[in-house]
Amino acid sequence: MESPAFFFTLFLWFFLLSITIYSIYIGFGPPSKRLRDPFEEHED
């Protein structure tokens, strides 16, 4: 368990997981109220 590859893999896993959780929070959480919708702005 002292292998550098193990710690690097663990770091990458936590990094990707945190980016995924942050993206979901931005997309669906309270900050999503400030996001603009280009389809609603477009008039036909």
UniProtKB/Swiss-Prot annotation:
- Membrane-crossing ranges are 6-26
The chain's disulfide connectivity reads: none
Organism domain of life: Eukaryota
Of which family is this protein a member?
Belongs to the PsbN family.
> In the record, what lineage is assigned to the organism producing the protein?
Eukaryota, Viridiplantae, Chlorophyta, core chlorophytes, Chlorophyceae
Q: Which PANTHER family match?
A: PROTEIN PSBN
Q: Where in the cell is it found?
A: Plastid, Chloroplast thylakoid membrane
One Gene Ontology cellular component annotation held by this UniProt entry: chloroplast thylakoid membrane
Return the InterPro entries for the record.
Answer: PSII_PsbN (IPR003398)
Q: Which residues form a coiled coil?
A: none
Q: Which UniProt keywords apply?
A: Chloroplast, Membrane, Plastid, Thylakoid, Transmembrane, Transmembrane helix
Identify this protein by name.
Answer: Protein PsbN
**Biological process (GO) annotations?**
photosynthesis
The membrane topology of this protein is:
Single-pass membrane protein
Source species, please? Answer: Oedogonium cardiacum (Filamentous green alga)
Give the protein's function: May play a role in photosystem I and II biogenesis.
